[in-house]
């Protein structure tokens, strides 16, 4: 017969949340390296091992996001609200950087223009 079959293959990206989760995991495990005279990457701490091709690496340590830093524009975390029930980035354990936090209850009264 005069027919032919056609196959098409393509690559598809993983969903955004999956990509973000993997990047965060790699960021948390990133290794600090230095560049050698031969332009190779060498770990600053040899106990952590040589980075693999899939590891994230950085030449400088991350800034302290807990403290105010005018040169980087970071306002720090002092005085920010946190959620004591959350284990995420908005949780008091992470956001308060081990400094402790104040717990207080706020009652807000508003006029509502309700009609009964």
Swiss-Prot record:
Disulfide bonds join 82-97. It is found in: Secreted, Extracellular space, Extracellular matrix. It comes from the Eukaryota. InterPro entries: Wnt, Wnt_C. One of its GO terms (cellular component) is extracellular space. Its main location: secreted. SMART domains: WNT1. The keyword Transmembrane helix does not apply. GO terms for biological process: canonical Wnt signaling pathway; cell fate commitment; neuron differentiation. Signal peptide: none annotated. Transmembrane segments: none annotated. A lipid is attached at residue 1 (O-palmitoleoyl serine). GO terms for molecular function: cytokine activity; frizzled binding. Gene3D superfamilies: 3.30.2460.20. Glycans are attached at residue 69. Palmitoleoylation is required for efficient binding to frizzled receptors. Depalmitoleoylation leads to Wnt signaling pathway inhibition. Keywords: Developmental protein, Disulfide bond, Extracellular matrix, Glycoprotein, Lipoprotein, Secreted, Wnt signaling pathway. Ligand for members of the frizzled family of seven transmembrane receptors. Probable developmental protein. May be a signaling molecule which affects the development of discrete regions of tissues. Is likely to signal over only few cell diameters. Belongs to the Wnt family. This is Protein Wnt-5(III).
